[in-house]
Every structure is written in C-alpha cells, then in structure tokens.
C-alpha cells in the first residue's frame, strides 16, 4: 500500500516537494549482482523536498520500521531484527548524498568472508553522520568474547561494498576476550566448525590482518585468554593498521604478577610473520615465568634450577614461519633478570661444582641477590658476567651458548676459603657436561663500571628492538 502526494511550486528553480507513505509485507531490492536488500513487514515514509540552505538542491527525509531487514554486498551480510531508521540526506553533487540520522535495532548479526565468526549486537542505536557512524555503549558479542564499544567508525558502507579502508576510534570494555577463538576465526575464515571447536588451538597458525583495517582502540578488559594463559585487568591502547597489530603500553596481571607490555604482530601474507614484544614483569615466580616464556628453557636453561621471585624485563623480535614457529637465525632479544633471596636447588650440575669447590653440604643454597643481563643475536646467547654470593664464596658467572644447547660457561671465584683465586669452566650440553679448573677470567668484569657498560649494551639492544616495532606499525619493513 502506498500514498503519494506532491506540490507544484511557482518557482521553477525550486525542487518539487514529494511525499510517499508505504506499507509492505515483503520488499526485495537489488543493485547490480552484488548488493541485495530484503525487508519484512515494513512501514516507510519518504519525503523529497528542497534543502533549507539551497532550494535548488534536493533533500530526502526517510524513516522505516521493519520486523526484519537484510542487506548483503560483496559477500558481506548484515541482518537486523526489529529495525528502525530515521535519516535525512542532502545532495552535495551529482553522485554524492550526505546522510544524517539514527539506525536502531533489537538484534544485529554481521558476517564477512574474512572472519569465521558472526558479529552479534544486542539492542542499540547508532548515529550516522555522512561516512561516520557513532556508537554509544554498543553491546557486541563474537563467539565467546563480549565487549561494549563507544566511539566512531568511518567508511563502513564503502568497506562492505568496495573493500575500502574501515577506520575506527573506539573505547572497549569487556568481561572476556578469547584470543584463541578470534585468531582461529582469522586463520579459518570459512570454517565455522574449526573456529568453534576449541578455545585453545592445538597448533597456532598464522593469521593475516585484513589490509583495509585501521583501528585505534582503548581497552579496559577484565579477562583475556591467550593460548593457555589468563590475563586479568588489561588496560591500554591497541592499534590495528598496515596489516599489523600493535599493543602499546598495556598493563595487566597474570601468574600472580604485574606486567607491562608492548607487542607487535605483522602478517601481510600467509608466507611469514614479523612479531616482537617488550615485557616488564614484576616479582614473578620463576617456575611460572618459564611456563609463560617457554623459550627461556632454551635461552637460559639454568633458570629452572632457581626458586623464588624475580623482576624480568625482555625485549625480543623475530620472524615466524606459517606455523608460527620462530625462525631461529632472526631471533634478537635483550633480557634482564633480577632477584633477591633466590634458592638454588640441588642438582647434578651444582653437586659437581660443590664437590670441586668444597661447598658446605646443603640441599638448598640461598643467593642474596642476582642481576643478570642476557642477549640473543645470530643464533648465539650471551650471558654477561654477573656477581653471586653463596655459602662462603663470591663468584662471577657468565658465558655463551648456541640455541642448539651447546654452551661454554665460566665461573670466576673472587672470594673463598681457598688460598687462591680460580675458575671453573663448564662446557658441552645438558646431557654431557665437562668441568675443568682454570684461571679466573672475570676478575674485572663485575666492577660497577663494567656492569654499567653491560647494562647500557642490553638496554641499547632493547631500544633498537622497540624502534623496529614503530617502523613496522608505520608500514615500513624492520631493519
């Protein structure tokens, strides 16, 4: 049913006023082969008339209420339940109209070919102002993840119909973000079963960031699941642009420790990934730390011999293969570990050293403090000499190892009950170690000046890694 009325102005330059009231049970429309629109049980009003500022240019007022509304374009589909639209559009030139108004709905479901999970929104209203859409406390659900979004989005229509850039500036709050499921939805965009089966992927796979995404997000997240880790109270900025994800100055809590993090992930194609992170973790249990960063077992295997809490700073970057494995020759890292009252647990290595140096027979030996600098470059790990005090001894420990687990460490005895200064050389690998008594090599390596130089070396390397992050986020190749 439709009612149409019009006016015939005396001024021939003035746009004719035309009004149409329409009520339909079903409405189908299409534009070309890709854009389709369907509506059920709809009431609509449309009015064409002159613009207020220029009567020679047309303006359209449009309102619609529909039990359901469906729209599809270029493989992207959007469906709304109990939809309401109130819009006004002024014509700017021959092909450009500028819409303003409100779109509301009880429920919305959105699907795109690049993402394996539907995006669902509950009852909300969004404001439209030209290409800008404004959200206010919009409730969004993606699989097991939920969030509330406030902010602006630009270019939604052109992103859906032409694949052009989609820009967003949003504040997000959430009770739960399941990164495993979201990553799966990017890794397997056409396989919903694969995405929904398990929150913990049995094997992490490379996922490519869509080229047309440019998001700046401020986050306040209660819980975030990533692999087998649970992060709580996550706050900070997340930028997604230039096919990269940049987590900037995030604060969080996990493994009973406070953390701050900067992270970058860039995947422009399925062939490989650049990834990097800069973590500062305060007073974390060593056993949990090794579980959190499993690569530490390879880089600093001696760490598992200690018990206690440490401050842990690490900056690292590397290229990953399509299965998200580190390409070892590309790994660069700068690590600092500091702890007080750490317990060295008894083991074969310590037992051999104790026998050689005549330590008192103890199952546990306490270090007053340690401060260790480690760097990784070109497949080699360097543990810079650091000072330890245990039992009646003061010693400097350092050395090198390959990521193939072959190592060459040295312990210089600087103070002991023995009448001479000596050193212990430890070489080989964890399965077959050789111990030799020799000269103390690190007599001058743990002076304040030497330690300061080492600190500077490690910090400079860490800064270089973080600077590479910034180049990647700006769309440049890391050097």
Describe the predicted segments one by one.
Residues 135, 247, 383:
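Short catalytic-loop micro-motif centered on adjacent basic/acidic residues
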Residues 1-122, 128-131, 141, 145-250, ...:
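Membrane-proximal interfacial segments on either side of biological membranes
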Residues 376-404:
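Extended serine/threonine-enriched, polar tracts that run as long, contiguous segments within proteins
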């Amino acid at each position: 049913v439709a009612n149409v009325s019009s006016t015939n102005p005396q001024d021939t330059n003035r746009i004719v006023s035309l009004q149409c009231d329409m009520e339909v049970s079903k409405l189908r429309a299409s534009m070309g082969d890709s854009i389709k629109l369907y509506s059920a049980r709809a009431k609509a009003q449309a009015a064409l008339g002159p613009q207020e500022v220029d009567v020679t240019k047309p303006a359209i007022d449009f309102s619609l209420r529909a039990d359901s509304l469906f729209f599809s374009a270029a493989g992207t589909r959007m469906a709304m339940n109990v939809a309401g639209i109130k819009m006004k559009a002024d014509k700017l030139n021959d092909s450009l109209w500028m819409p303003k108004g409100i779109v509301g709905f009880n429920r919305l479901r959105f699907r795109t070919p690049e993402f394996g999970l539907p995006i669902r929104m509950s009852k909300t209203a969004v404001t439209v102002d030209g290409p800008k859409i404004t959200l206010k406390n919009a409730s969004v659900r993606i699989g097991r993840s939920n969030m509330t979004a406030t902010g602006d989005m630009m270019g939604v229509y052109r992103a859906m119909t032409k694949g052009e850039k989609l820009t967003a500036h949003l504040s997000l709050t959430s009770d739960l973000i399941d990164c495993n499921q979201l990553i799966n939805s990017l890794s397997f965009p056409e396989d919903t079963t694969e995405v929904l089966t398990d929150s913990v992927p049995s094997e992490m796979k490379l996922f490519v960031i869509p080229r047309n995404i440019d998001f700046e997000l401020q986050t306040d997240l209660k819980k975030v699941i990533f692999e087998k880790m649970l992060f709580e109270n996550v706050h900070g900025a997340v930028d997604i642009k230039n096919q990269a994800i940049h987590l900037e100055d995030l604060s969080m809590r996990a493994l009973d420790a406070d953390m701050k993090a900067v992270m970058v992930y860039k995947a422009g194609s399925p062939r490989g990934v650049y990834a990097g992170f800069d973590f500062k973790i305060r007073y974390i249990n060593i056993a949990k730390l090794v579980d959190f960063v499993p690569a530490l077992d390879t880089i600093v295997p001696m760490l598992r011999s200690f018990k206690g809490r440490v401050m842990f700073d690490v900056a690292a970057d590397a290229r990953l293969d399509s299965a998200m494995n580190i390409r070892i020759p590309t790994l660069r890292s700068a690590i600092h570990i500091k702890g007080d009252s750490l317990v060295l647990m008894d083991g074969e290595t310590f037992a051999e050293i104790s026998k050689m140096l005549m330590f008192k027979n103890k199952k546990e030996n306490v270090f007053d403090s340690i401060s260790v600098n480690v760097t990784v470059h070109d497949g080699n790990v360097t543990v810079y000499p650091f000072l330890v005090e245990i039992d009646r001894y003061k010693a400097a420990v350092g050395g090198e190892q390959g990521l193939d687990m072959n190592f060459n460490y040295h312990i210089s005895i600087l103070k002991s009950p023995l009448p001479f200064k000596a050193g212990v050389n430890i070489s080989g690998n964890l399965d077959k170690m050789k111990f030799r008594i020799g000269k103390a090599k690190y007599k001058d390596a743990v002076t304040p000046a030497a330690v300061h130089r080492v600190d500077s070396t490690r910090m400079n390397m860490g800064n270089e890694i973080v600077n590479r992050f910034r180049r990647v986020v700006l769309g440049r190749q890391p050097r």
